[in-house]
């Protein structure tokens, strides 16, 4: 990991990201392929599907893809469009790790707390269970982490850094957490 500038300059300074999680991030994400922060979200399965819900393995979220069978004939199949291993590690492990940190040391814990409070105070989310709101807040904190990772990593690699859609099109400004 010491050979990767993103580890030395960014990941090592994020509370909740240890060497094992940093290894997962560095090995699973190709920052050269991520033109936008939302590209990382989509690859990690944290984007919003066409029905307005978070990406999942539900039938309506499957996409058609082509492949060559053993007779070299082109076939089509329905499958997921994200990296399930990465999604599990980011939401299940990294998200939980952020929550266990102090909000003073880990900005993503504060993002989690603020977003969860926002959800609990919103009339649109009152009917959702406590666990559902918790999962929504974890997902949001991980997405903010990925947005910061995108900016830091692309900058270190000398690649162009694009703004998020919410910044360019909607005028919503998010400050970097880390």
Can you say where each PLM-predicted feature lies in the sequence?
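Helix-hairpin-helix/helix-loop-helix acidic hairpins
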Residues: 1-17
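Basic, amphipathic alpha-helical segments enriched in Lys/Arg and hydrophobic/aromatic residues
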Residues: 129-165, 173-177
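Short, low-complexity, polar/charged sequence segments that are solvent-exposed and flexible
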Residues: 18, 109-110, 159, 164-166
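Central I-helix of cytochrome P450 enzymes
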Residues: 19-24
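Eukaryote-specific, cytoplasm-facing alpha-helical/coiled-coil scaffolding segments in long proteins
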Residues: 51, 116-121, 167-178
């Amino acid at each position: 990991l010491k050979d990767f500038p993103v580890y030395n300059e960014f990941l090592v300074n994020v509370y909740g990201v240890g060497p094992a999680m940093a290894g997962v991030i560095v090995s699973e994400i190709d920052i050269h392929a991520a033109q936008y922060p939302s590209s990382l979200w989509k690859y990690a399965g944290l984007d919003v599907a066409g029905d307005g819900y978070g990406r999942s393995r539900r039938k309506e979220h499957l996409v058609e893809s082509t492949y060559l069978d053993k007779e070299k004939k082109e076939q089509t199949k329905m499958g997921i469009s994200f990296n399930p291993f990465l999604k599990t590690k980011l939401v299940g492990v990294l998200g939980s790790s952020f929550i266990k940190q102090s909000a003073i040391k880990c900005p993503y814990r504060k993002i989690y707390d603020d977003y969860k409070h926002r959800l609990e105070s919103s009339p649109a989310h009152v009917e959702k269970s406590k666990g559902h709101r918790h999962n929504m807040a974890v997902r949001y904190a991980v997405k903010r982490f990925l947005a910061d990772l995108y900016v830091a990593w692309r900058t270190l690699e000398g690649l162009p850094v694009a703004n998020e859609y919410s910044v360019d099109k909607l005028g919503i400004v998010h400050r970097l957490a880390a």
